[in-house]
């Protein structure tokens, strides 16, 4: 009888332990292990559609003085007309938490001249992670496999590294790429590439 009671007690403990266990589903987009942020080669930068002659000299940039102790937010929403007559829409939402850096800094965001990427200045490392929401609409994605499109850090040496985020969306017919809550640890150049292969099977990337 004592043996039966002991077995019953152990069984109940195991069942309670299983009920209290955390959800073990993997979300690579939102919580990529640090080891996965390795440099990748053989990538291809996704180009911006060529501007029409009337828009050729247009530059898309924004600057704002931010108190690092307070934090702040910068939103840039612009568009231009491509040479084929279609609109290219550009959106950036940069969120800077309080305590990200010390003192006042003039933060500047500049759209790259050729590729789907943004330059962020001044170059510095943060005490707290910045959050970036960024999208393009009206890109020519017909020749790309959507499963290999990703948002990355573009290093000065030509290499790229994956960026932790809460999800990447690719809508091929409308030429849309969108990243949610990309975690920026430092300022540099960030943008969109086609990788040579799918390095991690992000389960929450939605392709249409």
What is each model feature region?
Residues 2-9:
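Sec-dependent signal peptide recognition
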Residues 14-17:
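C-terminal motif of bacterial Sec signal peptides marking the signal peptidase cleavage site
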Residues 19-89, 123-127, 140-208:
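Proteolytic cleavage junctions
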Residues 96:
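B-type heme-binding environments
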Residues 105-113:
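Low-complexity, Ser/Thr/Pro-rich intrinsically disordered linker/stalk segments at domain junctions
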Residues 112-120:
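Short beta-strand elements of extracellular/lumenal beta-sandwich folds
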Residues 128-132:
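Structural beta-strand segments of beta-rich domains
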Residues 133-137:
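Short edge beta-strand/loop segments characteristic of extracellular beta-sandwich folds
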